[in-house]
Design a protein with these regions (language model features):
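Long, low-complexity, intrinsically disordered segments
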Residues: 140-157
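Short, intrinsically disordered, low-complexity segments enriched in Ser/Thr and Pro
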Residues: 32, 128-132
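Short, charged, solvent-exposed linker or helix-capping segments at domain edges/interfaces
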Residues: 75-77, 133-138
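Two-component histidine phosphotransfer core
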Residues: 1-111, 120
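Short C-terminal beta-strand
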Residues: 120-129
Length: 157
């Protein structure tokens, strides 16, 4: 849909996920809001917009980066960082806050920063062994089955 809307004005570069990580259970819809924000708040008005998805593997985590080459004023970045780190349950729940909360439920995190492309960047830190799947001890004499129905939304307040 975004390709039809923006045509050739915006390029999206997607790094393929390395094979060993393709079976990793992740919370649903964690990338869609990041791409929507990159389009709508980062590169929407640009003639040569660029959105990039890339991965960095670590022994215990998979880091996922969504970045754009739009503007990223320091004041806006600081305000967003404070909002994302706020524990105020009365605060408005945006897509980024929702993704951050869902990542934290899995033992991961979401951080915002200046991206390597010069614009806004979001990094997701996803544990290779989520907290809920680490406890495979038996309960009532039965082995625990790994959770596969990941939440789509989280109540923020």
């Amino acid at each position: 849909i975004q390709t039809i809307r923006f045509g050739d004005r915006i390029t999206v570069q997607l790094q393929p996920l390395p094979e060993p990580y393709r079976e990793l259970a992740v919370p649903r819809f964690i990338l869609q809001p990041l791409f929507e924000n990159a389009y709508n708040h980062g590169v929407e008005k640009m003639e040569n917009g660029l959105i990039q998805l890339r991965f960095k593997m670590q022994p215990e985590f998979l880091n996922i980066y969504v970045e754009n080459n739009g503007s990223c004023p320091d004041a806006e970045l600081e305000k967003l960082t404070q909002y994302l780190n706020s524990t105020d349950r009365k605060a408005e729940c945006t897509a980024l806050k929702n993704v951050k909360l869902r990542m934290q439920m899995q033992g991961g995190d979401l951080q915002v920063s200046h991206g390597t492309l010069g614009g806004f960047g979001v990094s997701l830190r996803l544990p290779l062994h989520p907290a809920h799947s680490l406890n495979t001890e038996q309960q009532n004499g039965q082995p625990q089955k790994e959770e596969t129905n990941h939440a789509d939304t989280v109540a923020c307040g």
